[in-house]
Each structure stands twice: as structure tokens, then as C-alpha cells.
Amino acid sequence: MLLTLAQWLQNDYSFLRVVNYLTFRAVMANVTALVIGLGFGPWVIRRLTELKIGQAVRTIGPQTHLVKAGTPTMGGVLVLISIAISTLLWCDWGNRFIWVVLLVTLGYGAIGWVDDYRKVVYRDPRGMSSREKFFWQTLIGLVAAVYLAFSVSEASNVRIWSLFLSWIEGGMFADVPYKMNLIVPFFKEVSYPLGVTGFIVLTYLVIVGSSNAVNLTDGLDGLVIMPVVLVGGGLGVFAYVMGNAVYSKYLLFPHIPGAGELLIFCSAMAGAGLAFLWFNAHPARVFMGDVGALALGGALGTVAVIVRQEIVLFVMGGIFVVETLSVMLQVSWFKFTKRRYGEGRRLFRMAPLHHHFELGGWKETQVTVRFWIITMLLVLIGLSSLKLR
């Protein structure tokens, strides 16, 4: 919005030309989201407290968590509002990728909001059923995947619909450009052709998987938001490179016109995340809830797909991956041993993995900060793949 206004007025006010620079708008998006989050955070926390929207704590977990009962939750609403306002203020409204990421983020946020609302307001600990939640995640993920399959490969909005129709008429087979291949980091000449169907399947898995992985990681004060900020920032760098014809050619990456604008979204997400961390740091005054965790995970997955860095997301978001694997292994092993021995056994003291370390004697802040440090290192490894290829 401000970009359009600045372009309209820049002939009379030359200093407004600075708004044309993507990096300037990215910095301003970050600052705007940070200010909104810090400014409205106390008010949101008071309102959540007045409405008695408090967190329920399981008695089977670490006993130190019992004091968290009643802490306001659904604070992720503040994060999403900060991201949306900041992004819309500073982005190019004509960029299709911005709208895809925003719609996926807000769509997954809506799923999380309904889940949190049922848990807190209706006092239903189950919230949305797993089947219902998965249905809506799948619907949003597939719609986004189908659209991205053609918008990533085609620079013109006019051509996207005709490409989709030709794909349907061709029995869901079509020739696709190199930029739709699965890029293998650290190897400049290694990529795997996916085809349209393969691209759609991979995109769906990345978006839905990332959303649920971030949600599973959200279990300690400040644990998930800093990795989201770090990974989002790393993906923002990739977005800037992929959207720049010169840099992408120099670094031997496919050029994706319009992808650079996602730097605005990633910067806004980082600013909103840091503002939320101000209130979510131990001892937390507010929790994110599913409304924030599902949305931010979906956002990371969508950005990673657009900039063709699905494997890099897997690397940089290693904490999310390990947390998810710990739950899957715990459940699978428990079911297997129950069938085999008549009694379920556990691989970990408790899943997700952060609870395993807590029950092993680590303090909550130790788990959180150490997971942050690991994420910092993983993000640096991911960023190094820009040049080390």
C-alpha cells in the first residue's frame, strides 16, 4: 500500500523513492511488526486474562509446568495481526506470492483459532478432532500446492490459468521448467525433476508437515518462536536471492520473478516474533496457542516451497524435525511393544523431545536456549549452501 502511494507522490517528493528499495521496505516491515506487537501486547494479554482464556496444563507432564495453568493463551492472534498489517503496508500488492503466503498463514491460523477456542471457551480438551483438523489443513495445503505448481513456473499471472487447463486436458501431465525441480543443497548440478504432480505432493507435505512440526515444538516458554524467527529470516535471504536475476544467476539458482517480495513477509514475521518473545520469555505472560503455531509453521513451509528450498527448510528447521520424529517414534514404539509384549514401552521419558530433557534434569530455560543455539547453527549451515555448492 505504501509502495503504491510513494510511487504516486515520488515525482513531487523525491525522498519517497527510497520506498522502491526492497531492502528498505523489509527493514520497515520488521520495525512496524515489532512496534505493533510491543505496543498492543499488554492490552491483548489483559483482554485474554479478562476473558479467562487460560492455558490448561496436563498433570502427567513435568511438575514445574503446573504453575503455568491459567496463563493466557491464543496470543498467536497478536503475531498474525502484526504480520498481516506490516506486510500489507510495505509489500507490493500486485505480487501473487505475498497473497498466497498470507492466505495460507491466516487459513492455518483460523484452524488453530477454532481448535484453541473449543479447548478454552468450551472447556473441551480435545479441541478439533484430529480428522477435522487434518481435513482443513489438507484442503488449504492442496489448494496452495496446485496454485504454486503453476505460479512458480510462470512469471505472468495471465498464463497461470491456461497452464492449469492444459495440465488437466493433458491428463495431468505437462512439461515443467527446471525451476520446479527439487534442489539439493551444496550440489550445484544436482536436482530432481518432480513434474506437476510430484511438485503438488511435495508442496502439500512441506506445508502441512511444517505446520504440525512447529505446533509440536511449541511446549516451553519461548521455545518455538525464536527458531521461527531464525528460520524465517534465513528463508528471507533465499527469497531475496531467488527474486534477483543477477544474484540468482551468479549463485547458480533458478530465478523466480516476484519471490524477492517474500523478504517483506519474512521480515515482518521476524519482527512480530521478537515482539511476542518479549512477553513469551520465561516466565511467560502469554502463550501462542495453535492459532499461532499452526499458522507460522504453514508460513515457513509455503515460503520454502516458493523459493525452492524444501531441503534447506528441513536442515534449518532441524529442531522442528527432531521434535516431530520423537513423537512419531514414541507412539510407534509404544504401539509395537504393546502388541508384541502386551505392555507399551517408551523410547523417551516423554514426547515431544523437549519434555524428555526436562524430565532428565534440564531446566526449562536450559532446554529453550540450547534449542535456540542449535537452530542458529543449523540456519548458518543452511545459508552456507548459497555459496558452498
Swiss-Prot record:
Query: TM segments?
Result: 25-45, 74-94, 97-117, 134-154, 167-187, 190-210, 222-242, 259-279, 286-306, 311-331, 366-386
User: What keywords appear on the UniProt entry?
Assistant: Cell cycle, Cell division, Cell inner membrane, Cell membrane, Cell shape, Cell wall biogenesis/degradation, Magnesium, Membrane, Metal-binding, Peptidoglycan synthesis, Transferase, Transmembrane, Transmembrane helix
Judged by the first EC level, this protein's enzyme class is: transferase
The highest taxon in the source lineage is Bacteria
Pathway field of the UniProt record reads: Cell wall biogenesis; peptidoglycan biosynthesis
Tell me the cofactors it needs: Mg(2+)
Mainly resides where?
A: membrane
| CDD domains tied to this protein | GT_MraY (cd06852)
List GO molecular-function terms, semicolon-separated: metal ion binding; phospho-N-acetylmuramoyl-pentapeptide-transferase activity; UDP-N-acetylmuramoyl-L-alanyl-D-glutamyl-meso-2,6-diaminopimelyl-D-alanyl-D-alanine:undecaprenyl-phosphate transferase activity
Q: Give the record's GO CC terms.
A: plasma membrane
- Pfam families the record matches: Glycos_transf_4, MraY_sig1
The EC number(s) given in the record are 2.7.8.13
> How would you describe this protein's topology in the membrane?
Multi-pass membrane protein
**Family annotation (InterPro entries):** Glycosyl_transferase_4, PNAcMuramoyl-5peptid_Trfase, PNAcMuramoyl-5peptid_Trfase_CS
Q: Which PANTHER family match?
A: PHOSPHO-N-ACETYLMURAMOYL-PENTAPEPTIDE-TRANSFERASE, PHOSPHO-N-ACETYLMURAMOYL-PENTAPEPTIDE-TRANSFERASE HOMOLOG
Biological role: Catalyzes the initial step of the lipid cycle reactions in the biosynthesis of the cell wall peptidoglycan: transfers peptidoglycan precursor phospho-MurNAc-pentapeptide from UDP-MurNAc-pentapeptide onto the lipid carrier undecaprenyl phosphate, yielding undecaprenyl-pyrophosphoryl-MurNAc-pentapeptide, known as lipid I.
The record's family statement is:
Belongs to the glycosyltransferase 4 family. MraY subfamily.
Can you name this protein? Phospho-N-acetylmuramoyl-pentapeptide-transferase
* Organism (species): Cupriavidus metallidurans (strain ATCC 43123 / DSM 2839 / NBRC 102507 / CH34)
